[in-house]
């Protein structure tokens, strides 16, 4: 079934109409309490079969969901988005029934629907708090991350993300996840092996939220992957694999890259969060394979995919958050080049300069106000828009400028000559860069101009004439 069926008509005849006119309605809806009781009773019967009917044949039968029952429980799934229905389900202790299904039923579709209903109910604060503070419920839901059914995993992650987004109970879930060791392994397994883009995006959002909420948990997950050195053999072939968080994040990012920009944004943000702690940076750069894999993926994104020369400048509005994360991680890796000789990143300096300057050029274009106010009605008024106060655009500019200044400081005479020859550097591009870098990064600009002078004295003079503050100190 491709989608959840719509709820049925609330009445089937005159008698039903009379019932709904009385006390059978759920809140202000047209849904019937009696009908809902019947569906929930059917659920109870599914997970508590009569004695004497157990056996392999019965288990196989339980693994399949009758079409009529599936239709009815799917209607409940749709209905549970209504607050009155959700509160009624809570009052009737439906979460206990759904938890019983999750604990006992082998039917993947039924498990998916039950978690989905709980996810809808958790969108309402009172219900979310009730579900979250029940330790038994919490353990059952975390155990669902062991499920092999992608739709069930997707709904489980959606439910967890909903709960983690509620400030009143977020800490409860963080503590519970830290105490539940299988969560890390299950999440890493999904990221490293799943090809389901929707699932990868949602599990990425859960990891992103967890790392944002609790740095200690992030550090624990980073260190879990360091329990076995790269290339260390398994002494016991039956031993469970030890996952490292960075390769798992990279694999998931590669899967979602071409299909879901928002999902890629999530995984780049996870990498950026990892670089906010030294252990996270080391987890990326210490292992040659991981460091170089990370660099290659991110370098390819910014140099060959995002903000390309033939893209309209306004594309920056769509890509600003993912670009900020990518440049931030690349900058952290680049800063480790002296200590990590195995990182093969020097050849990327000139293409990165080209990409960074293009981002700054596009940013300048987006921030320009039309000379003729009437033009704003005809030339992309809402796409570009005023971005001076755009928080994310400012973050991108700050990160880009810091990264560019760092690259300028390590450029050799040979690299500058190559850049001038190949076009990554020019008077126009350098001027654009200086406008963004000065005055904050004055020393880096001064050092760069000194190197330029060794290669092209005329260009250095032109740049100093255009930017007197640089000339005064060189």
Curated annotation (Swiss-Prot):
Keywords: Nucleus, Phosphoprotein. The modification Phosphoserine is found at residues 6, 14. The keyword Iron does not apply. It comes from the Eukaryota. The modification Phosphothreonine is found at residue 387. Residues 1-11 have a biased composition (Pro residues). It is found in: Nucleus. Plays a role in promoting the proliferation of synovial fibroblasts in response to pro-inflammatory stimuli. InterPro entries: ARM-like, ARM-type_fold, Synovial_Prolif_Regulator. GO terms for biological process: positive regulation of synoviocyte proliferation. Expressed in the synovial tissue of knee joints. The keyword Nucleus applies. One of its GO terms (cellular component) is nucleoplasm. Residues 1-24 are annotated as: Disordered. Belongs to the SAAL1 family. This is Protein SAAL1.
């Amino acid at each position: 079934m491709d989608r959840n069926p719509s709820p049925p008509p609330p009445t089937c005849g005159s008698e039903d109409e009379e019932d709904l006119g009385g006390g059978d309605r759920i809140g202000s809806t047209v849904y019937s309490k009696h009908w809902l009781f019947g569906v929930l009773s059917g659920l109870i019967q599914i997970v508590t079969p009569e004695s004497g009917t157990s056996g392999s044949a019965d288990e196989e039968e339980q693994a399949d969901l009758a079409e009529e029952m599936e239709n009815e429980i799917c209607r409940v799934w749709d209905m549970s988005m209504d607050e009155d229905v959700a509160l009624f389900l809570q009052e009737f202790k439906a979460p206990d029934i759904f938890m019983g299904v999750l604990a006992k039923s082998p039917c993947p579709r039924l498990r998916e629907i039950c978690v989905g209903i709980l996810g809808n109910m958790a969108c309402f604060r009172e219900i979310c708090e009730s579900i979250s503070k029940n330790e038994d419920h919490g353990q059952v839901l975390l155990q669902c991350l062991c499920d092999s059914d992608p739709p069930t995993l997707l709904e489980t992650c959606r439910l967890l993300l909903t709960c983690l987004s509620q400030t009143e109970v977020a800490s409860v879930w963080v503590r519970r996840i830290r105490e539940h060791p299988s969560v890390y392994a299950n999440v890493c397994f999904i990221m490293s092996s799943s090809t389901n883009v929707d699932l990868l995006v949602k599990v990425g959002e859960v990891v992103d939220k967890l790392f944002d909420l609790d740095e200690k948990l992030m550090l624990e997950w980073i260190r879990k992957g360091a329990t076995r050195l790269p290339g260390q053999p398994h002494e016991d072939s039956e031993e469970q694999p030890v996952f490292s968080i960075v390769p798992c994040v990279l694999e998931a990012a590669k899967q979602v890259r071409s299909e879901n920009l928002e999902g890629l944004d999530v995984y780049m943000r996870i990498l950026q969060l990892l670089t906010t702690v030294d252990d996270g940076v080391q987890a990326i750069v210490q292992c040659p394979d991981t460091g170089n894999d990370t660099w290659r993926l991110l370098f390819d994104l910014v140099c060959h995919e995002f903000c390309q020369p033939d893209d309209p400048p306004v594309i920056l509005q769509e890509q600003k958050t993912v670009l900020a994360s990518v440049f931030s991680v690349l900058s952290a890796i680049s800063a480790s080049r002296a200590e990590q000789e195995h990182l093969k990143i020097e050849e990327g300096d000139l293409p990165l300069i080209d990409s960074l300057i293009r981002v700054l050029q596009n940013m300048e274009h987006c921030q320009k106000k039309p000379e003729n106010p009437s033009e704003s009605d005809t030339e992309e008024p809402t796409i570009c828009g005023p971005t001076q106060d755009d928080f994310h655009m400012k973050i991108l500019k700050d990160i880009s400028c810091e990264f560019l200044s760092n690259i300028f400081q390590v450029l050799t005479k040979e690299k500058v000559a190559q850049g001038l020859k190949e076009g990554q550097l020019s008077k126009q591009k350098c001027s654009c860069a200086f406008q963004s870098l000065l005055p904050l990064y004055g020393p880096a600009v001064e050092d760069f101009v000194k190197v330029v002078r060794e290669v092209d004295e005329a260009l250095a003079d032109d740049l100093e004439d255009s930017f007197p503050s640089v000339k005064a100190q060189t």
